[in-house]
């Protein structure tokens, strides 16, 4: 192992001595980014922060102070009745049973006798 390492070091030293290559000087790093465009007046934003207080919504008289911050939440689905729940569970059970039978049928067909 020492012989291999010595041979490798000798080869690298010989190759480095025979090449007239000099490492280039390191160039100074350029500033990152890109120059910003001048600030025209037709942009939707401005160069300086422009913060203005926005008034809150007026309070609704019937709801007190909460009226300004709440709105109606739509309710799309009613709670299912007992009959609807039974039909749903029956359909899910039948679908699971059919899937199980389908899997058993495929298993039997795949067997060789």
Curated annotation (Swiss-Prot):
| UniProt-listed Pfam families | Vitelline_membr
Which segments constitute the VM domain? 33-70
* UniProt KW keywords: Secreted, Signal
Q: Spell out the PROSITE patterns in the cross-references.
A: VM
MF (Gene Ontology):
structural constituent of vitelline membrane
Keyword ATP-binding assigned? no
GO CC list:
egg chorion; extracellular space; vitelline envelope
Signal peptide, first to last residue? 1-17
Q: What is its main location?
A: secreted
Q: Write down the InterPro entries for this protein, in alphabetical order.
A: Vitelline_membr_Cys-rich-dom
List this protein's GO terms for biological process.
Answer: vitelline membrane formation involved in chorion-containing eggshell formation
Q: Which cellular compartments is it found in? A: Secreted
Family label: Belongs to the vitelline membrane family.
Q: What does this protein do?
A: Major early eggshell protein.
Protein's UniProt name: Vitelline membrane protein Vm32E
Native source species: Drosophila erecta
């Amino acid at each position: 192992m020492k012989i291999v390492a010595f041979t490798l070091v000798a080869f690298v030293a010989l190759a480095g001595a025979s090449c007239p290559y000099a490492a280039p000087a390191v160039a100074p790093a350029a500033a990152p980014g890109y120059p910003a465009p001048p600030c025209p007046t037709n942009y939707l934003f401005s160069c300086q922060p422009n913060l203005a207080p926005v008034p809150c919504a007026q309070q609704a008289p019937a709801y007190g102070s909460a009226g300004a911050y709440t709105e109606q939440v739509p309710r799309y689905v009613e709670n299912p009745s007992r009959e609807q729940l039974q039909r749903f569970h029956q359909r899910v059970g039948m679908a699971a049973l059919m899937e199980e039978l389908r899997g058993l049928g495929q298993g039997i067909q795949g067997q060789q006798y």
